[in-house]
Amino acid sequence: MNCEKESQMTIASQSIEDFKECLYQMQEARKSVTNEILETGHIKADQVQIFKSTLEEMNDERTSKNHIRDIHSRGTTFGINIQDEIKGLQKDHHFLDAFAVESDKENNSFANVLKLCDLPGLLSKFVDDEIRFEKEVAECKAFLMDLIDTSTTGGIKPLFITDWDGTMKDYCSQYATNLQPAYSAIVMGVFSRLFTRAFAVLTAGPLRHPGILDLTALPINGPVLFSGSWGREWWLGGRRIVHDDGIPEEGSVAIGQLCEQLDEILHEGEFVQFALVGSGVQRKVDRLTLGVQTVFKQVPEDLSARYIDAVRERIHRVDPNSQYLVLENCSPLEIEVCVHSSGAVWNKGDGVAALVESLHDSLKVGKVCVAGDTASDVPMLKKAADENPENVRALFVNINKQLQENITNIVGDAKRVCFISSPDVAHAAFAQIISEFSG
C-alpha cells in the first residue's frame, strides 16, 4: 500500500482524497485479516505491516500532538480530529502483531491464541481507570454468560440486537472514516457465530456510500447482520432489503435529486470540508443527514451558516413548493432533510420487527439482548420487552442515571441489565468468553 501521494508543495497538509484513500485501503486490509482469522484462526506477520505503516502515516508531521490533522482540498485547508482513527490503529497493531506471532506456533488453537494475546489487558491500557475497566469487564462477562446459557431455553441460543456508534464502536469525529478496528470485528464475529442464533447491528446511518457495510471490518455476508436507516434497510442473504412504509415515491425521487445537488456544492471550494465534518453526508431511506459542525467546534460559525443556507437553496430547487422535503435542525452538529411521510414515525423498534420478520424468527423465543447507548435505542428494548418480558436483557453504554432507571424499569429486573462505560468493555468480555468456553 502507498499512502504517501502528497506533492512536495502540500507536505504540510494532506488532501481529503488521499486521507480517505489511505484509511480505506487500510480498512480493506482489516477486512481481509478479519475474514482470514474467522475462517482459519491464523494470520502471517507480513499482513500486519500495513497497520504499522498507516499508523506512522497518521502520526506524521501533519498531525499535532492533540490529534488534529491538517487536510486540504481545492485551496482550502482545515483541521480534523483523528484521535479515534489513531487509537483504533494502535490497538489493532498491538493485537494483530501478537496474534500473528502466537498463531504461527504449531497446534495453537484460536481460543488459546486469543487468550495469549490478552485483548482485555491490551484494551485496559487505553483507559484512564484500569481497575474500573477490569471490574466492568468481569460484570459484563457474567451478564453475557447468563445470556448465552441455554439450559433454561431448551437449547435455543439468544438473539443479540445492537446499536453501532457508541455501543459496539467508539464515536469518531468523522463519519466517513468511522472505521471498525479488526480486534473488535474478530471477537464480535466469533462470539456471534458461537453463542447467538442471530447477531444484528441496527444503526441510524445508511448501509452504503459510505455506510456501515463500508465502515465495518466484518465480512458483510458473515456471522453479523447489518442494517441502516433505523432498520429500514437490511443487508440479508447478499442483498439489500428496504422497508419503505409510508414514504411516497415522489419524496424518494426528491431525496435522490437533492443528493446529486449536494454532491455539486461539496465539490465547490468553500464547502469541501463538510464531506468530513461530523456526520458528513449520509443518504438514508427517508432522509439525508448532514454534518454542519464538529464536537470540537472546528468549523467557523459563519461558514456553517452559509453551508446550511446553500442546502436550503438546493432544497428549494428540487422541491420549490415544499411538498415533499422538510429541513430539520437536529442538533448544533447536524441537520436532516426528511421526506414527508404518512402514518406513524419509524423508529428502531420497527427496525427490529422488520428484521425478525425477514429472518422468520420470533422475539418470543429464547433470550433477547438489546444493546445501545442513547434514548433512540430504547424502542428496540421496548419491542423486545413487549414480546418477551421474562427473557429480555439490556446492555447499555455510558448513559445517564435517568436513562438507566428507565431501562431497568422496562426490563423489570436489575439482574438482567448491564451498564458499561465503553464498547471495549464488551469486546474484552467477548474475548474472555471465547477464550474460556470455545475450546
Curated annotation (Swiss-Prot):
UniProt keyword list: Hydrolase, Magnesium, Metal-binding
Biological process terms in GO annotation: carbohydrate derivative catabolic process; dephosphorylation; trehalose biosynthetic process
Enzyme class: hydrolase
Active site positions: D165
GO molecular function: metal ion binding; trehalose-phosphatase activity
Summary of the knockout phenotype: Lethal at early larval stage. Mutant larvae show intestinal defects, and a high proportion exhibit gut obstruction (gob). No visible phenotype when gob-1 is down-regulated together with the trehalose phosphate synthases tps-1 and tps-2.
The keyword Metal-binding is annotated on this UniProt entry: yes
Residues annotated to bind substrate: Q282, R283, K284
Cofactor: Mg(2+)
Binding sites annotated in the UniProt record for Mg(2+): D163, D165, D373
GO cellular component terms, A-Z: cytoplasm
Swiss-Prot/TrEMBL catalytic activity: alpha,alpha-trehalose 6-phosphate + H2O = alpha,alpha-trehalose + phosphate
Keyword Magnesium: yes
UniProt EC number: 3.1.3.12
Coiled coil: none
Highest taxon, organism lineage: Eukaryota
Tissue distribution of the protein: Ubiquitously expressed. Strong expression in intestine.
Entry's family note: Belongs to the gob-1 trehalose phosphatase family.
Function (record text): Catalyzes the hydrolysis of trehalose 6-phosphate to trehalose and phosphate; prevents the accumulation of toxic levels of trehalose 6-phosphate.
Designated name of the protein: Trehalose-phosphatase
Organism: Caenorhabditis elegans
Gene that this polypeptide is encoded by: gob-1
